[in-house]
């Protein structure tokens, strides 16, 4: 099991449990950015009496250790959660042995807000989805398509809600909504993505900047006047940035939602079940 850094303890359990339940051993390689969680997990399974060699832990860079695991002919299956490039490299390494590969990769999840949606519920859900783990989640809402008829009200509530998100160090302050980004390069990436969106014509409604000078904290951000071909719509954004696209025809919203190289998750907000199923059947996403 090759792990990312964004859910470093949960994903150990998610990969280990199916393997162990079905009578297999497992080798876990955590991200080099968050190695201690898997180490603690290994200590726990040792303390509860799991036989030596059933749960195994190795650390190192994915390009080195991950490659060796995927290429090893003794490995029966490789499960990776990570970037698209990491998935491609894993498949290539596993190919000579025709080793089974299971991948969960990047996402650019669209949220479609229809004219009859419960606006308050949609806003609350989308904000929660975008700021959880500071937006560093492959299946959280990354782009919003909202019906023109309700856009003004939706945007007012969305911006107000994003401005109310509590950001800080969870080791120092309780009752927070959002912590820091994973590292300095992630912070720089957010700054560049927002800057690029503005250069391409987007309008910054809130956020868009680093918070303070200590830590990798970034303001919850909303971008308006966004169009389909902008980088902020097409590229995965691992941070608390929400670009919003207006639509007048639901068929356009569906087409734009599908106009993306990712296909992990999506969401639809409507109070009409027929509308929900119609849109769901047309979206080319796994969830």
Which residues does each predicted region cover?
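Residues that line or immediately flank small-molecule/substrate-binding pockets and catalytic motifs
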Residues: 82, 148, 271
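Residues in well-ordered alpha-helical elements
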Residues: 10, 120, 148, 152, ...
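ALDH superfamily catalytic-core signature
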Residues: 77, 85-227, 256
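Conserved C-terminal structural/oligomerization subdomain of aldehyde/semialdehyde dehydrogenase
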Residues: 75, 112, 199-200, 210, ...
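Structural detector of well-ordered beta-strand residues that form the stable sheet scaffold
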Residues: 20, 27, 56, 102, ...
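Well-formed, non-transmembrane alpha-helical positions, independent of function
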Residues: 18, 68-69, 125, 196, ...
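Rossmann-like NAD(P) dinucleotide-binding subdomain of oxidoreductase/dehydrogenase enzymes
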Residues: 1-121, 175, 247, 275
């Amino acid at each position: 099991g090759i792990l990312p850094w964004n859910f470093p303890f949960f994903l150990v359990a998610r990969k280990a449990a199916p393997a162990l339940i079905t009578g297999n051993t497992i080798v876990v390689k955590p991200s080099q950015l968050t190695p201690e969680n898997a180490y603690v997990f290994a200590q726990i399974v040792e303390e509860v009496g799991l036989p030596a060699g059933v749960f195994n832990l190795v650390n190192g860079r994915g390009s080195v250790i991950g490659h060796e695991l995927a290429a090893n002919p003794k490995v029966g299956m490789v499960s990776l959660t990570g970037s698209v490039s990491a998935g491609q490299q894993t498949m290539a390494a596993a190919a000579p042995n025709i080793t089974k590969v299971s991948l969960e990769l990047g996402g650019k999840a669209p949220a479609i807000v229809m004219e009859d949606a419960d606006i308050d519920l949609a806003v609350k859900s989308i904000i929660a989805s975008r700021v959880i783990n500071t937006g560093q989640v492959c299946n959280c809402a990354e782009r919003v398509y909202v019906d023109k008829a309700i856009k003004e009200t939706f945007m007012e509530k969305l911006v107000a809600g994003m401005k109310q998100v509590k950001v800080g160090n969870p080791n120092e302050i309780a009752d927070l909504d959002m912590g820091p980004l994973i590292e300095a390069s992630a912070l720089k990436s957010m700054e560049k993505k927002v800057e690029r969106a503005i250069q391409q014509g987007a309008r910054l409604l809130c956020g868009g900047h680093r918070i303070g000078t200590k830590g990798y904290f970034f303001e919850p951000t909303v971008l308006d006047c966004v169009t389909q071909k902008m980088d902020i719509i097409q590229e995965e954004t691992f941070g608390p940035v929400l670009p919003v696209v207006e639509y007048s025809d639901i068929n356009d919203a569906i087409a734009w939602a599908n106009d993306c190289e990712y296909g992990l998750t999506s969401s639809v907000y409507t109070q009409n079940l027929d509308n929900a199923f119609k849109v769901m059947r047309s979206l080319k996403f796994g969830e």
